[in-house]
Amino acid sequence: CEKMVEELCTRYGDLYMIWFDGGADDPRGDGPDVEPIVNKYQPNCLFYHNIDRADFRWGGSETGTVGYPCWSTFPAPCSHHKRIESQKDQIALLKQGDPEGKYWVPAMADSPLRGANGRHEWFWEPDDENNIYPLTTLMDMYEKSVGRNATLIIGLTPDPDGLLPAGDEQRLKEWGEEINRRFGTPLVETQGRKQRLTLNLNEKQPVNYCIIQEDITKGERIRQYKIEAKVNGKWQTVCSGESVGHKRIAHFESVETTALRLTVTQSVALPAISYFSAYNVTLK
């Protein structure tokens, strides 16, 4: 196994991530000693995982979604560390993280692309194209993973020729286009380091989504927030939440408004908001 990992790390250029599903044991157990090989040849590669190191954490399911709130910080340096007292504690921490955690271990959601109709297939099989997830399901995954401060990994299935099947490729293209259609052009946007930010629209118009992003180089400072819309001259709350981090996609009932206001109601330091934007998304 060590030779295989060395080949992978030396013959295929820079690797973004190497992921041992279920974990890579180490010489203290019965497993191969792979982490030093990755460290030597791919020092910038994300590693997942053994009992000493996990650069991110699994979000607790293979549905392509994570729970909410979802914090990037964690009480231990890796998600399967012996410091975590029980399996029950571990499962809860995998799903939500710990806002007071000292370590940066962000969540990862995963799902196979061919997971519809109860299939959940990680590897290619013939005549399986009807189990490619529909676009609506994939968008739901996106909003409940990336939109909840996690990353999203989709399992793709190369065919026996080493190629991605045309149906899979087409669905991925449609997915990218739909993400861009929904969130590529905001009605209005702003940023700032303050407790409150306001978006003023040119005229009254419907809004049903907002995106908030923190400058995560400063950590996750926001603990609670609310978004209000100005309706007939008065502010009314349209949604509220807790974790923001890299990205929070907030979906709420469409409201006709002239302005939106983000108020951070609880934080551990002055909020560093890198992006606050509003959208009117027509859902297909």
Language model feature labels by segment:
Residues C1-N232, T237-F252, T263-N280:
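Mature catalytic domains of secreted/periplasmic carbohydrate-active enzymes
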